[in-house]
């Protein structure tokens, strides 16, 4: 008769290295011994097969998944829907790769070991609610805004080098008037440089006009989504729809995964990083975090410095103490991050009350 130890179910941890078309998984037992490896396609059936494979090995205590915001997003959602614990894992550091090399199996094993060691404690974004809708619309808007700017810049460049008659007709006009005028150009047969310039300007102007309408349409959808997702956030001084949307995307649909003001500040790159050694106690700037969220906080601070008397008094007080303007702005960004965190938590805990 087998002992009790032999009758106990094996407890395993699974690490997954994610890619566009295939995921590679490694399962470790509770002692860190490699139990099995596999690979599955990134399809719904592949996700089901991977989950069945893991459950067939024993009791799954947790999953370490790389790229839960990109290639691993679909798998993370599937595992969460099956009520499995998923941890977000960053790629192995350079020292690990120097020692063990780089392969999908090595990365998957490192992900599993990160979970067992408690290093991978991050909770992935759920990607299932209004914030995910805001995220995808913001991607489309950012692309449209970039092309919108490129179109008018290209038009200005062409106008500078255009034949004199055409250049003089368009010089000094505002952007809307330049676009309107260029949309009406008639190049005719492309037999001269002037005709070619007119043809190019008309195409760029029409592109600019179409992108303007596209941006307006996206803004019309983003505004109600953002206001509904975090009404208290949009009431903060200096927080507009675009800034609020970016901060929501950074926090995710499940901001409760951020356990404190400090964790949100670190995520936004506004928390100082300790750099002490021996008897020296010092901190350095945080160059990490979500730089788009950091930029959003910066915009809020700049607006408040221009229009909020309390912020202006704080700036005057700290500069009188010897702080530079840049140093004071860093302090203000941290204060704003705390306000944003409180607003996000209120909306997440009780959206009806926040509204």
Task: Describe the residue ranges of each PLM region.
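Short, basic/hydrophobic alpha-helical segments
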Residues: 45-62
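Short glycine-rich phosphate-binding loop at a beta-alpha junction
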Residues: 59-71
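Glycine-rich, often acidic, oxyanion-interacting loops/wings at catalytic, nucleic-acid
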Residues: 137-232
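Short alpha-helix plus adjacent loop in nuclease-associated cores
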Residues: 80, 86-126, 132, 182, ...
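Phosphate-backbone recognition surface of nucleic-acid-processing proteins
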Residues: 47, 235, 241-325, 353-354
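Short glycine-rich, Thr/Ser-proximal phosphate-binding strand/loop in the N-terminal lobe
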Residues: 21-45
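Gly/Thr-rich phosphate-binding beta-strand-loop-beta motif of the actin/hexokinase/Hsp70
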Residues: 2-29, 111, 144, 246
């Amino acid at each position: 008769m087998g002992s009790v130890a032999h009758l106990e179910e094996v407890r395993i941890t699974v690490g997954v290295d994610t890619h566009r078309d295939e995921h590679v998984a490694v399962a470790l037992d509770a002692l860190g011994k490699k139990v099995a490896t596999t690979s599955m396609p990134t399809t719904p059936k592949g996700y089901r097969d991977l989950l069945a494979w893991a459950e067939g090995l024993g009791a799954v205590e947790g999953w370490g998944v790389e790229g839960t915001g990109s290639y691993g997003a679909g798998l993370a959602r599937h595992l969460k829907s099956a009520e499995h614990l998923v941890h977000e894992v960053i790629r192995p550091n350079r020292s690990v790769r120097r020692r063990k090399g780089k392969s999908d199996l090595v990365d998957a094993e490192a992900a599993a070991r990160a979970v067992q060691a408690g290093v991978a404690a991050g909770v992935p974004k759920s990607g299932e609610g209004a914030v995910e809708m805001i995220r995808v619309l913001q991607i489309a808007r950012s692309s449209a805004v970039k092309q919108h700017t490129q179109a008018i810049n290209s038009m200005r460049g062409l106008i500078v080098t255009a034949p004199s008659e055409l250049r003089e007709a368009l010089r000094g006009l505002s952007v809307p008037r330049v676009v309107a005028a260029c949309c009406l150009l008639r190049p005719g047969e492309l037999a001269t440089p002037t005709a070619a310039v007119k043809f190019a300007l008309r195409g760029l102007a029409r592109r600019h006009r179409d992108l303007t309408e596209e941006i307006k349409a996206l803004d019309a959808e983003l505004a109600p989504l953002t206001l509904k997702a975090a009404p208290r956030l949009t009431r903060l001084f200096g927080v507009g729809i675009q800034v609020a949307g970016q901060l929501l995307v950074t926090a995710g649909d499940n901001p409760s995964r951020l356990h404190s003001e400090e964790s949100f500040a670190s995520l936004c790159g506004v928390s100082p990083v300790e750099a002490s050694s021996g008897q020296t106690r010092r901190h350095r700037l945080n160059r990490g975090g979500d730089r788009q969220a950091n930029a959003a906080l910066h915009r809020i601070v700049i607006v408040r410095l221009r229009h909020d008397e309390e912020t202006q008094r704080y700036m005057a007080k700290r500069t009188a103490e010897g702080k530079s303007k840049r140093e004071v702005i860093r302090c203000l960004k941290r204060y704003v991050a705390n306000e944003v965190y409180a607003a996000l938590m209120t909306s997440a805990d009780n959206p009806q009350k926040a509204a």
